[in-house]
Curated annotation (Swiss-Prot):
This is Formamidopyrimidine-DNA glycosylase. The lineage of its organism: Bacteria, Pseudomonadati, Pseudomonadota, Betaproteobacteria, Burkholderiales. Monomer. Keywords: DNA damage, DNA repair, DNA-binding, Glycosidase, Hydrolase, Lyase, Metal-binding, Multifunctional enzyme, Zinc, Zinc-finger. It holds the Pfam family H2TH. Involved in base excision repair of DNA damaged by oxidation or by mutagenic agents. Acts as a DNA glycosylase that recognizes and removes damaged bases. Has a preference for oxidized purines, such as 7,8-dihydro-8-oxoguanine (8-oxoG). Has AP (apurinic/apyrimidinic) lyase activity and introduces nicks in the DNA strand. Cleaves the DNA backbone by beta-delta elimination to generate a single-strand break at the site of the removed base with both 3'- and 5'-phosphates. Its cofactor is Zn(2+). The gene is mutM. DNA binds at H97, R120, R165. Its EC number is 3.2.2.23, 4.2.99.18. InterPro entries: DNA_glyclase/AP_lyase_DNA-bd, DNA_glyclase_Znf_dom_DNA_BS, Formamido-pyr_DNA_Glyclase, FPG_cat, MutM-like_N-ter, Ribosomal_uS13-like_H2TH, Znf_DNA_glyclase/AP_lyase, Znf_FPG/IleRS.
Amino acid sequence: MPELPEVEVTRRGLLPHVVGRRIADVTVRHRGLRWPVEDDLEARLAGRLVRRIERRGKYLLLECVDEATDDAGWLLVHLGMTGTLRVLPDAPPAGAHDHLDLVLDDAGGSRIVLRFRDPRRFGAVLWSPLSEAMLPGHPLLRGLGIEPFDSHFDGSWLHRHTRGRSAAIKTVLLAGNIVVGVGNIYASESLFRAGIRPTTPAGRLSLARCERLAQSVRETLAQAIERGGSTLRDFVGSDGASGYFQLECFVYDRAGEPCKVCGTPVRQIVQGQRSTFYCTHCQH
C-alpha cells in the first residue's frame, strides 16, 4: 500500500509536469472505485488550470481553478492499495486497470496524459468545491493527525497525545489520528530506530522515548522519500520508476533474518491484522 513517502514522491514527480497546465479532456473508464467517481466530474474539470498540488496524509490534492471566474476546487486522489498516477507523453492504449485520464495542455500546445491506474480499485478520485480555508473540514481530511514534518510534531506532541492510551504504540501510529502517514512499513522501521518494542502501550512511553520516536519517524520518512519510496509489488512513481527504500529496511519483511545491528533473528508478529517486525534485543 502506498504510504506517505510514496504519495510525496508522486506529488514531487507531478509538480514540474502538471502544475500550470489546463485540463483539456477527462476520460473516466470505471467509476466504481473505493467511492464512486462523480457522474459530472468530466464537466467540472474540463478547462480548469491545475494551480497547485499539495498532500495531506496519503491524499494528493490538486487545486483546479476556472481562470474566467477564479472559482477553485480540489481534486482529491487516494492511491488505495495498488494505485499509481503516471505522467505519459502521449495516450497509449488503456489497460484493464487504467480507470481515469486527465489530458493536460500547456500554453505552447504540448499535451500530456495523467493516468490513474488501480488494479484493486481501493483508490479514489473525488472532486471538492471547498475553498482552501474550508478544505481541512472535508469528511476525509478532518480526522487526520498532524503532519510528521510539521514543526509542531515532536516528542512533546507525541507524549501529550498518547497519555492514557493503552493500545500498542505501533497500533497508535497506524491509526493516523495523532500523526499521519506512518504506515505499516515505516512504523516498524521507526520503532526499530527508536529502540521501542511495537507492543509497548503508548501511554507508558516516557517523554525521552517519545522524543526519540518522533525523531525516528521524521528521519525514516525523509530517507524513504529520498529513496523514491518502497516498491513491494505495485508502486511506481509518476515517471514509472520503482522505489528502493525496502532494500535498506532494518526489520520490515526480514522475519528470521539476523538483525543488522546485533544479529538476533528478526521476529514477526501480527497486530491488528498487519505484520509487525522487530528485534527482541534492540527494542524494549
